[in-house]
A protein has these predicted regions:
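Single, function-defining residue in the core of a domain
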Residues: 1-239
Length: 239
């Protein structure tokens, strides 16, 4: 089973989730993705399909992705870059492959960036020509928030093992976990709670059967003990 998620970085809240079988190719999820005009969609190169990427252009939306190593293209224009920022090139290109040029006939922007921290070179593709080249690299870096989202789900909502083996049982557990994440994220934002999502979830789980108002439980200044005991529980032996 695969879980494809569109994460809105303005609040780190999933706005689109598609559950598919493990054998389904990642790129097919783009057929189900609702495209919002003016929005940026950041994805890894497993989703590179030029016919599907061209849909973003026709819907007045933008994408940022990594180019595949065997990309066949011709350079139309090069712009100056400040190499002290890690940028190596900022080009306007046209796809040169017989099939790819037919599937995506419009120009693309190719940005090359060197990450000094990892000593790696990244080549990005986008259909946006107005934002700074460094912003293109920054947008792709923000894709890491999706990885953090899945890590949070696995660590805090216990999807390390499934309680059932049927398709319906697995999907139900996944949707419950995602719904819990969204509710906690909304709660944090609406109540302006200065705690991590993990801390909020832990407090809620420990005060689940109490009559304490949620806002009081989250802003009281008390935190669960490091061993996970309820901080409202009385001490059995007061020595």
């Amino acid at each position: 089973m695969k879980l494809h998620t569109l994460l809105d970085l303005r609040g780190n809240i999933p706005t689109f989730v598609h559950v598919s079988h493990g054998k389904v190719h990642d790129v097919t999820v783009l057929d189900h993705l609702p495209i919002e005009p003016g929005a940026f969609y950041v994805m890894d190169r497993g989703y590179v399909d030029f016919a599907r990427l061209h849909r973003f252009t026709t819907h007045s939306a933008f994408f940022v992705t990594r180019a595949k190593r065997n990309l066949d293209y011709t350079r139309r224009e090069s712009r100056r870059v400040d190499k002290t920022t890690g940028l190596r090139s900022d080009q306007t290109i046209m796809l040169a492959g017989v099939k790819s040029s037919r599937l995506h006939p419009d120009p693309l922007r190719r940005v090359t960036y060197h990450d000094a921290g990892t000593d790696r070179r990244f080549v990005f593709l986008t259909n946006n020509f107005t934002i700074p080249a460094l912003t293109v690299a920054g947008l792709y870096k923000s894709r890491w928030q999706v990885e953090l989202f899945f890590k949070w789900i696995k660590q805090n909502l216990r999807i390390k093992a499934f309680f059932g083996t049927s398709e319906n049982a697995v999907k139900t557990q996944v949707w419950i976990a995602i719904s819990t994440y969204v509710l906690v994220a909304i709660l944090k934002r609406e109540l302006k709670v200065d705690r991590s999502l993990s801390a909020i979830l832990q407090i809620l789980s420990l005060t689940l059967f109490e009559k304490t108002p949620v806002i009081q439980a989250l802003t009281s200044g008390k935190t669960p003990d490091s061993d996970g005991r309820n901080f409202n529980q009385m001490t059995l032996f007061d020595l």
